[in-house]
Every structure is written in C-alpha cells, then in structure tokens.
C-alpha cells in the first residue's frame, strides 16, 4: 500500500515542480512570471530564491539532475537555462525559441545535452548548445503537428521524442541532431531516424495531457481528456502496433503520468488522487487508487516565519454533503477541515523521487492546492 507525506505547502498553486538530484532543493511554477526555488531547512523547507527573468507566465520548468541545470519556458515565447556557479549564485542564459505563440512544456533529454519545448505555435523547439558560438540553438519539429503541444517525453535513446497534442493525437518523432547525437540503434520505432521523422501517430478521444515512454522505450502511454489511458506497443516502422490498449476510467481526466516499472503506471489529475495501472501487452487495468481517502492524516507545515501549523483531515462525504445542502437551503455553512484526500485540488504534476528508471519506488506530486506530496510505493 502506498504511503504519503506532505513535504511542503506552498502559498500559491503549483502547476509544475522539479527536484535536484540530491532532493535537497526544488523549483515550482505558480502561474506568474516567477519560478520559486525552495531548499531543505532541517525537517522543513524554506524559500531560497525567485527567478523572475520571464515577462509573462512561466508555463513549465525542469531540472537536469546530472548537470544541475534548470530550464524554464513561458508565455513570453522564450526559455531560460540557469546554471549554478561555485559561489552559489545562478547564471541565466536566454534561449530564443523562435516561436510566435506561447511555450507550453519543456523537458531535458536523458543525456541533458538537449531540451525540447512544446508550444501553441504547432511546433516543438529542440534546443542544443553550440560551443563555438556559446549559445543555445533551436531547431523546429513541425510535421505533422496540427495543434498546441501539451506534453512531451524523451525516449531513453536521447533521440526519439513523444508529444501529446490538443488535436487528440500522440506522436513519436525523431529529434536527432547530427552534431550532438550518436547514431541510434535500430528499435521498434525505426532504424533510420533523421530529424523530424514521424515514427508513430496514435489517436485519442480528447486532448493528450500526458505522454511517457516505458523504461525500455518499447511502449508508449498517453492520457487523454476523455478520462482514458492508452498504452501502445509498436511492431515495426510504418506497421500497425502489436497492441493498442485503452483503459477507460470512471473518474475525471488525468494530467500527468509516469512509469513505475515496465508493468505499472502511476497517473494523476483532476480527481485529486494518484492511481495505479498495471498490465502488459495482453491487457491493462486500473487496479487501485493510491489515496483511498479513508484514513486520517495530520502534518505540520512550517512557513517562512518558522511557525508550525498543524492540519488534520479528512472529513466524511456525509459531512461535505450536509455542508453544501445547508449552504443552498439556509445560506449557512460550517467549517470543514479538508477533503478525504491528501491533495485538496487538482494534481498537476508527478515526478520520480527515488529508485531507478525501471523501478521507481517513490514519487512526488504537486497541485493547485499548493501541496508538494511524497508518495512511497
């Protein structure tokens, strides 16, 4: 059974978060032009720094664990790369994405020598560093994208890129850069992979909010706005997939997913509770909610002032129903401490926390309730 621990309560909603490799610092976006950095302080967390170089709302952030670099993207159509100096200060570098619409999503590649930025301009900017000119260069993936890119994920080979889009499609494209990447080995996705090769295109019943390659890279999972998760097992280039399995959920849509191992996927979204899906090429199923909302939890939140505040929950469904009935009939309400789940609102992002890519043992979640929660599988 999964256990949870509230690491920190942010003063604002969190739409994206990322930890450093030591898990001693994390950054978060809060629907402003700022990125907030928090660092561990004893048993709690304290605000350490604010990055405010963007002019408009920061839409996504990612932290490269090996190189310790942070990348951000924004509605101002640009990206920034932050590198930590030996004296503890951060050097920021502007990356021109050459977009005419907002940047929506960003992820470092596994080797951390490239990053990809989705956008509302129907293109993906693949950025890499040119040593000769000392700047970041962007190349555009365009074909066959027809709408806003909502999510991205890199294949373990550092070349293939999965994209979830608002045109109700999930794509697998080649982001091979000749001066950066070694020639990739042949796989089920193809052997000849020049830049912008379309390796696969899969349908969905709604916007594709999340995509993710399996640890082996031989399967792709994606979550649609129709409350479904689809797992695709490709067979060969330009051939129908060996299996295309769709799991229909009886809950609100998912926003984020990650592979715990080759046969388990953790996903979360508008339903406030992470869920576990398990299966293989023969079939997948939603096996359980990781937050059943049946046990009482308590935690202490330490803010910047150092004052602790203990909160307890949850309350029963009967109490919630009674409260809303009284508000409707009598115009009165009674105090309710919390909902029956650890998260009190939408879960926006899931991130691996402990384990290896093929065996994730713990992950973190953040959402619009401002909570950053650690889950142990």
Swiss-Prot record:
It is found in: Cytoplasm, Cytoskeleton, Actin patch. WD repeats lie at residues 9-48, 53-92, 98-139, 144-183, 203-242, 342-376. One of its GO terms (molecular function) is actin filament binding. This is Actin-related protein 2/3 complex subunit 1. Functions as a component of the Arp2/3 complex which is involved in regulation of actin polymerization and together with an activating nucleation-promoting factor (NPF) mediates the formation of branched actin networks. GO terms for biological process: actin cortical patch assembly; actin filament branching; Arp2/3 complex-mediated actin nucleation; cortical actin cytoskeleton organization; endocytosis. Belongs to the WD repeat ARPC1 family. Residues 293-313 are annotated as: Disordered. One of its GO terms (cellular component) is actin cortical patch. Its main location: cytoplasm.
